[in-house]
Amino acid sequence: EMMSRVPMLSDQAAIWTDVKTAIKSRIFMMGSGADLIASINKITRLEADTQAFNSQQKAVYAQRNEHFKSIVPVFNSHKNIVCKEDECIRAETTIQNLSALKPSFREIGESGVDNLQLKYFSELSEIVHIHTAGNSPAMSDAASMTLLSSSSSSASSDYKSRGIIKEVSVVNADPMLVLSG
């Protein structure tokens, strides 16, 4: 993903920007699914904020103690920019400043998504909107690489194997829950 160059929703895809299309497809933004999951599991805003705070504190500790050794620096020769650490760790995060943030997905919920979710999850009387910019995943650029090889290829190289894939399976859940599998 390259969120700094292609911001979320900048492609104006109807599945994300047109509630009628999303409702017809039963595919929603992750935040709508997160609020639905919070509603089903009775997760409170304070619990979500506390989890976010604890996560940030663990990340700060790990970064300060150099536990992110697998991060490889990325150099941009045109702008002389070096990315060598996770830039989304927020050491200044507190429960107080998290609690002051407004829910990010209430508006899209009120535009029709909540009603559809309530139709399919009739045990719920409301969708709680607890997710904010502070307790949701950061919007960031990301890259990763996985090097896969055969056993014989690994044995003949200078790289030490870090794992073995023994089985693969595919699982899918209700698309309205988005984040559940």
Where does each model-flagged region fall?
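Flexible glycine-/small-residue-enriched beta->alpha junction loops
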Residues: E1-I37
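Catalytic-loop motifs flanking and including active-site residues across diverse enzymes
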Residues: R26-M30, A138-S144, V178
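N-terminal extracellular/periplasmic Venus flytrap/periplasmic-binding protein-like
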Residues: E47-S152, S156
